[in-house]
Amino acid sequence: MTQSVCILGVTGSIGRSTLKILGQHPDKYSVFAVSAHSRISELVEICKQFRPKVVVVPEQKIAELKTLFAQQNISDIDVLAGQEGLVDIASHTDVDIVMAAIVGAAGLLPTLAAVKAGKRVLLANKEALVMSGEIMMQAARDHQALLLPVDSEHNAIFQSLPHNYLQADRTGQPQLGVSKILLTASGGPFLNHSLEQLVHVTPQQACKHPNWSMGQKISVDSATLMNKGLELIEACHLFSISEHFVTVVVHPQSIIHSMVQYVDGSTLAQMGNPDMCTPIAHALAWPERLQTNVPALDLFEYSQLNFQAPDTQKFPALNLARQAMRAGGLAPTILNAANEIAVEAFLMERIGFTSIPQVVEHTLEKLENAAAESIECILDKDKVARSVAQQYISSIGG
């Protein structure tokens, strides 16, 4: 019997990799619903191949999609719009597995809807957990949802932890003999740049990651190390561990995807070629394993693996994220919102690369923190933080 999959963000990098895995295992999985934001022609090609029952696009893309469907004689796919449509497909009774791969805060409500519907949720949208934190984790416990990490680092940590770790008490302290999590970072394309060189970085340069094929936003986040900061917050929530038990290690080759240290002196690592198909396949099939076309790691290709501490003087975003996690409450929401606005401004060449963390720091300092008591107050603070960040960008000439 096949399992029914909903892919939120199907035309993005994670969505396309997910389709690649599903296409290799039609006996195990079928595509029930997909969503896309802007690449409508690509979405139509996906629909022709995988024949989902439902598609969700923004309201302003409905007419374009229906026109293309008519040209291709596609009449058996329901079309829904906007956030309401995303929530509908993420929580649909016919869906078994939800791939949460929408980038940014836009993925929060549909991801939470999938969790509250008790789905197996493959979490690629780190921003949803950064914003909602313990609300999301409590919802997963209350509704018996299975929240499995797809980020290569968190998937590596999950594989390196004891098999029953997620069922351990959520105390903020390491459990079951774990002493520390080592979260690896490639260091991004500007690892060896000077501060002076970083000032002149272009969006085109920032979007060229040395090891991974990714979308624009996450590529820029990787270049600033904000991606690692967001992943640190995500790790703290997923694995119920305080931030001072998580150490970021720069590992330029991206072969070791993260590590877990134990009280007996052991360090367990998950290794593999940098290909998102591996963690996606793992999360889809866990606790079983799926065949993929990813080649096994050839250790003889690597004469050495390098590790170093991150330079937080050059890349202050990492410390900003750590401080936001330490502060708790709505601070991670403010951090994420300001970063999304700053990255968008950088990609539009309104601000420089080194201004991205400045926008985030200003917004964190400007806004008062408070307890994250509900999704409504999180969304309200997200909106305010975006406005403050926009105002600051305008004030510095962006």
Swiss-Prot record:
1-deoxy-D-xylulose 5-phosphate binds at K126, S152, E153, S186, H209, S222, N227, K228, E231. The keyword Ribosomal protein does not apply. Its cofactor is Mg(2+); Mn(2+). Pathway: Isoprenoid biosynthesis; isopentenyl diphosphate biosynthesis via DXP pathway; isopentenyl diphosphate from 1-deoxy-D-xylulose 5-phosphate: step 1/6. Mn(2+) binds at D151, E153, E231. One of its GO terms (biological process) is isopentenyl diphosphate biosynthetic process, methylerythritol 4-phosphate pathway involved in terpenoid biosynthetic process. NADPH binds at T11, G12, S13, I14, N125, E127, G215. SUPFAM superfamilies: 1-deoxy-D-xylulose-5-phosphate reductoisomerase, C-terminal domain (SSF69055), Glyceraldehyde-3-phosphate dehydrogenase-like, C-terminal domain (SSF55347), NAD(P)-binding Rossmann-fold domains (SSF51735). Signal peptide: none annotated. GO terms for molecular function: 1-deoxy-D-xylulose-5-phosphate reductoisomerase activity; manganese ion binding; NADPH binding. Keywords: Isoprene biosynthesis, Manganese, Metal-binding, NADP, Oxidoreductase. It catalyses: 2-C-methyl-D-erythritol 4-phosphate + NADP(+) = 1-deoxy-D-xylulose 5-phosphate + NADPH + H(+). Its EC number is 1.1.1.267. Catalyzes the NADPH-dependent rearrangement and reduction of 1-deoxy-D-xylulose-5-phosphate (DXP) to 2-C-methyl-D-erythritol 4-phosphate (MEP). HAMAP family: DXP_reductoisom. Belongs to the DXR family. NCBIfam families: Dxr, PRK05447.1-1, PRK12464.1. This is 1-deoxy-D-xylulose 5-phosphate reductoisomerase. It comes from Acinetobacter baumannii (strain AB307-0294).
